[in-house]
Amino acid sequence: MILVVDNYDSFTWNLVHYLMELGAEVEVVRNDAISAGQALSSGADAFLISPGPCTPNEAGVSLDLVAACVDAGKPLLGVCLGHQAIGQHFGGRVERGGLMHGKTSPVLHDDTGLYAGLPSPFLATRYHSLIVNAVPDSLVVNATAEDDTVMGFRHATLPIHGVQFHPESIATEHGHAMLANFLAIAGVELPSRLREGLGEGLSANAGAAMGTRPPLPPPAGGRGM
């Protein structure tokens, strides 16, 4: 099961639907409705911290969950605000960048982590005004925009990954494949029909398939910082 922390953002539900389309079981909880300890006790195989319209310091359990996943060695994906929370936890600076709401950018990457098997560059949709700078050595930058803005990183030794852009946006290329690679990192195997459909943009070591749920209606929400 993937536990998704919803930072009160409508994009959360796009992520949920993508994960379910890939065969994952998903539980969603608001950022002020659970503690990090409760999250770890939920039985989740992996965690996802969603986008949101605030800073990491205002994002409820998000920073505490990053710390808990680090201590427990649990797989974690942070998207936009979640990416910033991971960066801040490890000592990166979260600061103002250019306003990138609804803009697409080419993303260049090193073919590791979430980007295994994907072409470089690919187009990604960005909804943010904050970025992570001064990324510490514990985080390996593995994706950048053409102006060298950090678009993604992975922890050097832990299964922790962050993306500044939105893989769940319809205008982002290979979004399902990136999330499939995260599920593979978390040990969740895709059904063979999905693995074949994703083709080259899928990591080779996907783990065991999980059941799907009917789509969930999105709550009112904002856009990522």
Give residue spans per PLM region.
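Cysteine-nucleophile active-site neighborhood
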Residues: 41-116, 123, 179
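Proline-centered loop/turn at the N-terminus of a beta-strand
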Residues: 1, 75-77, 93, 140, ...
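RNA-binding accessory domains that recognize and position tRNA/RNA substrates
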Residues: 1-10, 168-195, 202-210, 225
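Hydrophobic alpha-helical packing residues
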Residues: 19-20, 69
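A generic "structured core" feature
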Residues: 3, 22, 28-30, 35, ...
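Glycine-biased, low-complexity coil/linker segments
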Residues: 195-197, 218-223
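Phosphate-binding/catalytic loops
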Residues: 121, 157, 162-173
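Catalytic beta-strand/loop cores that center a nucleophilic Ser/Cys/Thr
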Residues: 111-158
